[in-house]
Amino acid sequence: MWYPPAAVVPFFESHSVTYEDRSAIAKWHFLPFDQRAVNEMTVLLNFLHISQGFHNETLYTDVRRRCMLMRSLFELVFANNYLELTNPKLLGWFLYLTAEDRTLIQNEGGLLSFLKKHPELGVTRQYVYVKAKPKGNYVPPPTTMASNDSRYPTFYGSSGCQNCGTSCPFGTKKCTRCGVHIVISQDKISVSENEKQLQLLPNSLKEELNVFQTSQSNVEMQNIHLGCTQSTLNTRSKQRSPEAHPHFYSKGMCSHAQCLSQLWQEVESREDAKHFKDTSAQASFCLDMELDVQSQVQRNDNTQNNQNQSYNPTEENDHNVDQETMPEYYSFSSISLDHTAWSNGSQSAETGFNDSITATKGSTELSDELSEAANSTAANSTDCFSCVSNSFELAEESGDCLDSRYEQQINKSNVGSSPKSKSSASVYVDQMIDACGDFRAFFTSTCATKTDQTFQVKNVATDTDLPAVSHEKDTQTMRMTTSDKNTITEVYMSDLDVLTEEFIKLKETEKGLKQMKSMNARRLCGCDCAQRVRKAELNLLALQFVMCQQHCWRRYFTSPLGESAYQGTEALPDSIAETLKTLQKDYHEMRQQILAGTPLDDLAPLSVNSEKISTGTNYSPSSVLAAHLDCAGSTIASDHKVDEEHTAMKVPPSEVCQDIETAPDEAKNECSKRDKALFILPKQTRISTEPKTVGANKDLNGSEAWFDAEEELGFPNQDGNMEKPNKMRETMRHKMETKGTDEDVSKQSSLLCITCLPGNITEHEVLLWFEKYNPTNVCISAFSNNTRAAIVYLKSYIDAKAAVEDLNGRSLQGHAVQVVHLSGTVSADLKPSDLSHSASESHKEDTAGDELRTKNLTYGSSHGGPRCSLERLTNVCNSPTASGTCVPQHYATMGSFDTIMARLSERHPNVARQRIVDALLELRAKHQGFLSGLPLRSIVDMTSELLTQTSSSARV
């Protein structure tokens, strides 16, 4: 039996190869496909040949395909030692199969079942690997088989017809079934990288090595010399994409280039090839190794000749298929090579010489057309020597009888040829033998340009070039791109530290995830409703706390104790301090209970007891809100009720001026309750409160750029809607006036409160100013902010009302004086001290109102929650906010504007205030936006002219 030559595959020794040079270090062992499986398949095919009557039936085709698939799969796994079942190479191999091949595998039970049924592959978990094989060459016992069944060889060394797909021996010109000529396109013959390396040789050396082809007939020999590596995959070459085939299945080249290319690839991947520093030394080593291999092959052939002298079958060229005898059948799937099995082939091929690798040594398996083609090209192929170097069995033996062996081979191959051909062949062999020294010299001088140890590594499965391997072994952290999972890395301490750190981070992350899951499990639902409800309850509790604080401050500053404390700088009394501390303590306790999970509805409402501050009961914001929601139209007093003024204005208590103390409803309150006076101060104009005395401080800004500030017509305690406070003020004033007309005039108060007085005015001057209204007494009081107010007592209520209508808003020594009628009954024996007290109380309502509201709102404007400090704070800002007193930007320069407005109001009492402001803006536009350089009298005169012109034009 003859076995086809073995494919040279690198065998890696994992116990002695490190990560860096694992893909570079290779020991070239001949690992044959298991011969027992080969023999079994041979017997099976012989039986099929006999039973099917030499025809290419479906069963025979399926078995052939199955064997071919097993062969291809074995080569893929063998090139990588082992593969994962999900490896892209294995999956790509399956996807590139034809539909018939995939159907065949699916009929076997799928790819996994097909792998398990493979005789040379094993499947463990998620990996497929090559089973252990004995190292070295396996020499099977010689077997003799004779049969008259089939003239077909096996799949290797055969090709398929392009018309009918019938398998024909490789090199056959005409199909034996349909008679169509088999054409092998020369354009598809690819040029390998090794041939490119051969092109670098000098022309003289190429001629000596006889690399060039001299005739067209050599193209046919190239197809014959493809050998077992071509195999039956050529029958599928036109059905698959080029990426599906390894490159070495489609290489076509001359026998010399094929031998040298394979030698080059073998030595380049060999273990000791790493020690060469340039390609010239590698080329020399290739030539030496080729000569050694040829020497060893010759010795093996001589040994086999002595043992098997009786085994010398001759080739018969019988064109009759029925009378053809079955030759020595050879294996169709073996990759091993036994040189003794066909040692007599070269001697017995005298009648039909064929030096192809796939030629059957000592058999007649080739067809007649193949024999004719070989005979026709024998004369032109005398320069070709036998390519037995495909075995590439590396040995350290020296070639002793190279000359005699080569001459003997040439003499055998040139039987029947002319003497001229013999002489040329002899010269060629001599040149091949003597070219060793010249080869080194030429190649060293032309190609020895690299000094680094860098060379290409071939992938056996796909015959593609892998990235250049660097053999430096400095550190393990060098990044090397690998697509296979067949490497074992050595672990160093630095890598262990990194892995430990990553493991700790992973554990911490898992711990955090577990905590988050436990927190989510505690929630009532999957959303954040519970957190939102808790946040809303905390905000509501904080609002109630602020309302209680405001209530305490309002009670305190409207009491006599708060009035005296406001005029001085003394500390807060113990009553208000203790009340606020108790409120603060209750607030924090309720907040902690809410955070612990107790709903706000289950807790007692937050309240404050203001009995220590002034007369009153317990105040609870929640009860006030509940009463307001239950009975929106009812009037509720300060003890948890809303007064009738609040109900009439339809605004909550927080929007009402906080310095107004409502009077109890007569229908709801008992007669024992104390009546309280309701002080209503109209909107005060923002004027300078500094006294105009000699040596007094002037305005901070002398430019009098009052025109840059717009007039603020809104309520001083609000920053939004300005119409609502005006309506509220008018409604309350109308009620007081109506109430005054219904009661007895004699019982009404005749007290007037005059504010915004100049700093140098005296009581006598005030009496003279109210002379026509019958004043009886005047009391002037000065406050800590240099503000002065006077209380004027008139004889009758009618005089007081007339004085308010005539003198309110008039200018007194350059100041716009505000005159307010104090409501309520006044006893006849009113003393000056009482008048002073009333004046202080009335002026306190106006001047200290802003500061009181500032204190109250300061506690509610803290970003971190309600302010717990009990000190008197003042929050002054440049822009209006809901939590602070708004100080206009040009507050210190508004004195001149107030003076101009007062004088224009005196000259034009029937003109509205907004019309005067429009006239001033028009005057400023005429002077290009600057009025600061003009005296105030000139500005008043020019504005008055504009108002007069506008009035006259409106009348016309």
UniProtKB/Swiss-Prot annotation:
> What is the role of the protein in this entry?
Component of intercellular bridges during meiosis. Intercellular bridges are evolutionarily conserved structures that connect differentiating germ cells. Not required for fertility.
- Residue spans of biased composition, Basic and acidic residues class: 840-854
The record's Gene Ontology cellular component field reads:
cytoplasm; intercellular bridge
Record domain RRM: where: 750-824
What organism is the protein native to? Danio rerio
Entry annotated with the keyword Cytoplasm: yes
Does the record bear Ribosomal protein in its keywords? no
Ranges for the region named Disordered are 301-321, 831-855
Q: What is this protein called?
A: RNA-binding protein 44
Location(s), subcellular: Cytoplasm
Enumerate the GO terms in the molecular function aspect.
protein homodimerization activity; RNA binding
Major location (coarse) = cytoplasm
Which domain of life, per UniProt?
Answer: Eukaryota
Enumerate the transmembrane spans: none
Query: In this record, what's one Pfam family?
Result: RRM_1
Query: What are the alphabetically sorted keywords of the record?
Result: Cytoplasm, RNA-binding
